[in-house]
From Swiss-Prot:
It is found in: Periplasm. Pfam families: TolA_bind_tri, TPR_6. Belongs to the CpoB family. Residues 1-26 form the signal peptide. This is Cell division coordinator CpoB. InterPro entries: CpoB, CpoB_C, TPR-like_helical_dom_sf, TPR_rpt, YbgF_tri. It comes from Escherichia coli (strain K12).
Length: 263
């Protein structure tokens, strides 16, 4: 009896241990697993989904904005590279012209047509802030436009406008007999502004493209002055000697001789 009783008691204890959790689960509130709980979870999932959608939208917009910035920077880099290439090419042209003058090379006697074409791609331009300042509008008449540019030279407050006017003149009237003078004045105006490389470019252009112009001797002398200003005594002497030999008796040759005597 005692053995059977123990077995029955053990069996009853096991049944109670197993049944208790199920009873507790059965007594749990229906709301925790009912329709309200599902709706809450659905609502929460919808909120999460909406938040994810908003985040994705923001990320896409940010990527789009970043791409626009990258494209803009790429454009600026390309523009800066182009401008740098132009500056380098212009410096090469200036050095070639000065070297040919100081060495008395045959390049100074070459046809102006080929040189004008080469110079056109590297011609120095006016500052962006003054390019559209107040230069006269093209009249269609070379004499009128040249005289208008000269009038600007005489007005000390409009030197930048004068530079633009002469640049436009060279562009608009490529066959004008005033081209040597226009280039000479551009050289002088740039020199007055301290732009000696640009000044040397224009003075050298007069000598190379228009060696028989009355302005050629003075223009070559000015190239020598610029070389002397820059501390290149050897080139300055060579240019002065070229002025004396190529244009004897001219005012430019006389000035060159004075410079040589003082060096």
């Amino acid at each position: 009896m005692s053995s059977n009783f123990r077995h029955q008691l053990l069996s009853l204890s096991l049944l109670v241990g197993i049944a208790a959790p199920w009873a507790a689960f059965a007594q749990a509130p229906i709301s925790s697993v009912g329709s309200g709980s599902v709706e809450d979870r659905v609502t929460q999932l919808e909120r999460i989904s909406n938040a994810h959608s908003q985040l994705l939208t923001q990320l896409q917009q940010q990527l789009s904005d970043n791409q626009s910035d990258i494209d803009s920077l790429r454009g600026q880099i390309q523009e800066n590279q182009y401008q740098l290439n132009q500056v380098v090419e212009r410096q090469k042209q200036i050095l070639l012209q000065i070297d040919s003058l100081s060495s008395g090379g045959a390049a100074a006697q070459s046809t102006s047509g080929d040189q004008s074409g080469a110079a056109a791609s590297t011609t120095p331009t006016a500052d962006a802030g003054t390019a559209n300042a107040g230069a006269p509008v093209k009249s269609g008449n070379a004499n009128t436009d040249y005289n208008a540019a000269i009038a600007l030279v005489q007005d000390k407050s409009r030197q930048d406008d004068a530079m633009v006017a002469f640049q436009n003149f060279i562009k608009n009237y490529p066959d004008s007999t005033y081209l040597p003078n226009a280039n000479y004045w551009l050289g002088q105006l740039n020199y007055n502004k301290g732009k000696k490389d640009d000044a040397a470019y224009y003075f050298a252009s007069v000598v190379k493209n228009y060696p028989k112009s009355p302005k050629a001797a003075d223009a070559m002398f000015k190239v020598g002055v610029i070389m002397q200003d820059k501390g290149d005594t050897a080139k300055a002497k060579a240019v002065y000697q070229q002025v004396i030999s190529k244009y004897p008796g001219t005012d430019g040759a006389k000035q060159a001789q004075k410079r040589l005597n003082a060096m």
